[in-house]
Amino acid sequence: MKGGFSLNSELQLEADAVIIGSGAGGASVADVLTAAGLYVIMLEEGGHVPSSSASPFASEAFAAAWRGGGLTAAIGRPPIAYAEGRCVGGGTEINSAIAQRADSDLLDQWRKLYKIENFTPDELSQYYGRAETTVNASLTPGPLGRPTDILRLGGEALGWKVSELKRGQRDCKGANRCSFICPNGAKQSMAVTLLPKSMDRGMRLLARTRVDKIRIEKGRAAVVVAQLQDAGGQGVHVRVKAGLVFVCAGAIHTPALLRRSGLRKRIGDTLRIHPTIRATALFDEPVDAHQSRLPLTAVTEFMPEQRIGGSVFTPAVFGLSLAEDWTNRGDLMQAWRLCGSYYGMIRPRGVGSVRPLPGINEPLVSFKLAPEDWISLGQVLTLLGQAMFAAGARKVIPSISGHEGWTNPDEVDEFRNKPLPEKATNLMTIHLFSTCPPGEHRDACAVDSYGRVRGVENLFVADGSVIPEAPGVNPQMTIMALAFRIAEAALSHSSRERAQSAARE
């Protein structure tokens, strides 16, 4: 390959374009730019973890590929744990690779509300198609395992719509290590698909390189200032000059970087997530979820506002989930083969914020749920409990500290149309969006309809930050679709700019 994952000690670099972040957004931008013949430098804060060296142990895998080792949370009542990838390939290395498009009605709603140009479902369809082709979005052949059957049987018994989920995969072996980096390269993450392709075209990727700031001069992003950690653990200062700059560091670190660079207008003020409540279902017969793929069906009857699905299950991950209330839940560890882990997620009305802190790498993240979000969480938890009992569960234990669990279907009505207890409820999310909403509604949007940061001619955002609101589905396909679209628009914008400059000369 012409590019590479290796570190480099050069201090002064120049390129046609620099991309900050190597996840779904950054890799998609790189694919467009390198195909157009541009010389691209990509900067990634995390390291490269090849499939061949991916650890099967949760503690090692989290430390290698997850930001903060998986221990990150948004401040609020309650704090909400969230997950981000921090490695070459970003979140695509640790997610479930589920491939879904955002609802067409929702896309139209965003187009009108934020005044986003050329944003109809038909106009976005080509980009979604490109994303799906890239990752080979497909149904998983063969038996899917009892965890999947449980969710399907429960939903169908209640007369709900249940959908089998497409995933980005080729010849999945069912290792059940999606969250730990796929050990055989079957999951079609960015490190398997687009990044090698872009590097073959000459892209240079610097791993373990944290970007500190972007220097803005005369309305342009002039220099990207970063620090690379070399093989000996020493820091090396790096400065990159490029005609085009793309920030693709995710919905948390993109706004943090922009604000550190002096760009604050409507940036980092509108964080959206998918608040998620989990429940453990205990059955009389072994589920052996650790031997199966994560559940590959979802209850889609109530989408896009609410969705019910299943989680990756290993003994270690299950133990971590019980640790939130070990006094009352620890005994379930002895029955772990009889257990399955499921969740309900919602599209919230509440919003959060992202603020960088002086001298600290991690920004301050906060999120406040709206009152109606608590009602919605109570509803989706009720639905989840109903589905588990309909599938034959003996007991369902919601992720609420001190809760004794339900032992029959009648008990799950406890929170029907009622708010969950704020202090005791344990929430999490793996989906983060909307900190740089796009559009021509200048009072609401941080970037224009094509991802360009207002007031900076050559600076673009192309990651989950530009999904206008929570989409109610796994976001990878939407991130990739928008990144393809933004990269194409940036090339067109750059061509027009060069032509205008030549005309002036």
Curated annotation (Swiss-Prot):
It is an enzyme of class 1 (oxidoreductase). This is Uncharacterized GMC-type oxidoreductase y4nJ. SUPFAM superfamilies: FAD/NAD(P)-binding domain (SSF51905). It comes from Sinorhizobium fredii (strain NBRC 101917 / NGR234). PROSITE patterns: GMC_OXRED_1 (PS00623). Keywords: FAD, Flavoprotein, Oxidoreductase, Plasmid. The active site is at residue 431. InterPro entries: FAD/NAD-bd_sf, GMC_OxRdtase, GMC_OxRdtase_N, GMC_OxRtase_C. It comes from the Bacteria. Its EC number is 1.1.-.-.
